[in-house]
Curated annotation (Swiss-Prot):
Species name: Rhizorhabdus wittichii (strain DSM 6014 / CCUG 31198 / JCM 15750 / NBRC 105917 / EY 4224 / RW1) (Sphingomonas wittichii)
Catalytic reactions on record: 1,6-anhydro-N-acetyl-beta-muramate + ATP + H2O = N-acetyl-D-muramate 6-phosphate + ADP + H(+)
Gene expressing this chain: anmK
Residues engaged in binding ATP: 12-19
Keywords attached to this entry: ATP-binding, Carbohydrate metabolism, Kinase, Nucleotide-binding, Transferase
GO molecular-function terms, A-Z: ATP binding; kinase activity; phosphotransferase activity, alcohol group as acceptor
A Pfam family of this chain: AnmK
Protein name as it appears in the record: Anhydro-N-acetylmuramic acid kinase
């Protein structure tokens, strides 16, 4: 199959920054990572995106908004700059790049209402860089009755090819999702498991002014409040079978209010771990290995709690020889290539769509 140079861009619901990756891939089994960079958002940009998301969630459906348009313009400019810096560091000319997979920023995800909203101007990016851009990768799936998430399973399948199954890949971003890959061809199940870093980050920002709990140190000093944890886990969403997906705002830190800063961090961290354990009940068989990607793998307190809750030792994705910080961005580069080739990026077992479906909108310079 034809190999392409592809850039992938990811800005997650944790609002920590932009991940940009350059890979060579055929959209199937060939993947060669070339370069990666991560650019953190300044506090002002983070707040602008947070306000845009809060506004979007108040709408019944996506509609024009000056505040959201301004956030989109800022976001697009930042992503264009990230691509230029990535290519300069890799000594790759724009003309050598076949496509950019531009996820954009999710500001509202409402598949139950038939829509999902990722801001990011793909046409403006294509003009600015002179490179084809594929964006809006989730909307086609939602329009076809799918959840629109998670999308990374198609990339997880490629990364774990050749491993003895079943294997699970757990992505700990703002929201957590799990991909289960069985021993047989086509055995692919994926769904959101619950909040991951999102609630912990919100708590830390409110209680300490820090955007996250570095190395889980704050949670490690606290004590889990079992009553609060039990109340948070008493939610029918965790019993619902997959496919299912979440908006980052579907759960809040409200139940932890009144706890000390450390105890709240410990309780919310335990909540993430316990929801991962609950998710394993929905899998056809326990995974032999639990591979962990996303920022949450840098939190040793969370990783220990996941091990205790699941009785499986979680392994950072680096155990496979991959850069766990780059996985999501690489995945969207991979999906952009598949989109150009008309190949599926979502499946009945991952989003609930009726049949394997491609996605994305292509913008030419």
């Amino acid at each position: 199959m034809t190999k392409m140079l592809a850039v992938g861009l990811m800005s997650g619901t944790s609002l920590d920054g932009i991940d940009a990756a350059l890979i060579e891939t055929d959209g199937a089994g060939h993947i060669r990572p070339i370069a990666f960079r991560s650019d953190p958002y300044a506090a002002q940009a983070r707040e602008q995106l947070r306000e845009a998301a809060a506004l979007a969630l108040s709408f019944d459906a996506p509609r024009p908004s000056p505040k959201i348009a301004a956030a989109e313009a800022m976001l697009t400019d930042r992503h264009v700059a990230a691509v230029r810096q990535l290519l300069a560091a890799a000594r790759v000319e724009a003309g050598q790049v076949d496509v950019i997979g531009f996820h954009g920023q999710t500001i509202a995800h409402r598949p139950d209402r038939g829509w999902t909203w990722q801001i990011g101007d793909g046409a403006a990016m294509a003009r600015a860089l002179g490179i084809r851009v594929v964006n809006d990768l989730r909307s086609a799936d939602v329009a076809a009755g799918g959840q629109g998430a998670p999308l990374l399973p198609v990339y997880h399948r490629a990364l774990t090819a050749g491993m003895e199954g079943p294997v699970a890949v757990l992505n700990l971003g703002g929201v957590a999702n799990i991909t289960w890959l069985g021993a047989g061809e086509g055995e692919l199940i994926a769904f959101d498991t619950g909040p991951a870093n999102g609630l912990i980050d919100d708590w830390m920002l409110q209680e300490t002014g820090s955007p996250y709990d570095a190395h889980g140190a704050f949670a490690a000093r606290g004590t889990v409040d079992r009553a609060v944890l039990g109340a948070m886990l008493d939610n029918d969403w965790f019993d619902a079978p997959p496919p299912k997906s979440l908006d980052r705002a579907d759960f809040t830190i409200q139940p932890a209010r009144g706890l000390s800063a450390a105890d709240g961090a410990a309780t919310l961290t335990a909540f993430t771990a316990e929801t991962v354990a609950l998710a394993l009940r929905h899998l056809p068989a326990p995974p032999r290995r639990l591979i962990v990607a996303g920022g949450g793998r840098h939190n040793p307190t969370l990783m220990k709690m996941i091990a205790t809750a699941t009785k499986i030792t979680p392994e950072p994705i680096e155990a496979l020889g991959w850069n766990g910080d780059a996985t999501e961005a690489e995945g969207f580069a991979y999906m952009a290539v598949r989109s150009l080739k008309g190949q599926a990026i979502s499946f009945p077992g991952t989003t609930g769509v009726a049949e394997p479906l491609t996605g994305g909108v292509t913008h030419r310079p």
